[in-house]
């Protein structure tokens, strides 16, 4: 049973469950592992715009340097940039301080290996053990204490990497960017501007407490309304740490991760760059996505929910494209993790080179009506194993008869049960979703 790590690193309310003390212990635990392999290993640390990032960064740095690790801080930067820099400047580990799409009160610690990929389960468990035994970790002797460096200039390496992912520019396309008052604020507008796109921005004035506050990919209506009101060709909304993105077309229609994956897959297939014509998705992808994939001579494989599972499947089989409906899109030829800016640049380039609007490109996917209900529960494990709930799910699945589906899953980061139904009409999704959700609420909901 994990004590600290969830499906996407360590997360908690800053100052409560995620304290300076815990952050120091995480740094010391990671430092212990790294210094066992070499003297003065290097760790790069990035952050989003939350007010608590200072506290966590300084505590992590103290823990790392106390064991002899040299630390380079790069300031506010997207998560995929940390993953990219960790690999390309040959550091021994990378850390991103962020709680992604969560409100500013939360924060988190994501750790990457020297290859730019997130840690394995075994590595995380090893760190957990050391966190609880930091009193047994020796401090470095005075002459071997680690040093702290500033690496703010390294952001430019990531900027160049993204710009070089396409040939040509993005001139002639009017784009709106919603940076969620988060980690993409100082980078995304700069990249699109350099690529000669005509850009408008919102959510680019972080103040420490407004990250994801009515902006970003979890508040997609904000960018949708902006696009409609300002005669924009395409809008992109990033999440707080920039590892995912959702799009909207010129009419304000949402283009989610499923549609983005389909557009990218079709393009990559035409370019001969899609390994085995395969797209890796999760069980949350819409039935309409799978039908469009099949109709266009593409293949797909499903994983559990979570970008780490998508990446694992891609690495095991050397696949080049994968992602989630929520907007985590992994282009493995360019990145080791989901990258919202890279995805947005690639999608805009397809719009320009194809001569088609985003409406036309996304219109090939007919999305089935979908309803998702989140229920805060007392015990998500018991809810997932409850016989009455499971029987009701089987009953719904049978009634849908292959023309829809029901999915019951527990959140990996919160004490939530998610009930998702897809069917041929909104009436059916509402009916079946409520049918199951009612039982979950009656038996397990937090009152």
Q: Whereabouts are the PLM-identified features?
A:
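Phosphate-binding and adjacent anionic-ligand microenvironments
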Residues: 271-447
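Gly/Ser/Thr-enriched, mixed-charge loops and adjacent short helices
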Residues: 13, 107-228
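An N-terminal, well-structured beta->alpha segment
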Residues: 1-62, 66-67, 145-175, 381, ...
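Proline/glycine-rich low-complexity loops and linkers
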Residues: 125-159, 164, 250-323, 330
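N-terminal small/polar loop signature for handling phosphorylated ligands or for N-terminal nucleophile
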Residues: 32, 39-107, 190-248
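Glycine-rich phosphate-binding loop
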Residues: 92-106, 227-249, 253-254, 298-339
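Short glycine-rich phosphate-binding loop at a beta-alpha junction
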Residues: 40-48, 72, 174-176, 278-283, ...
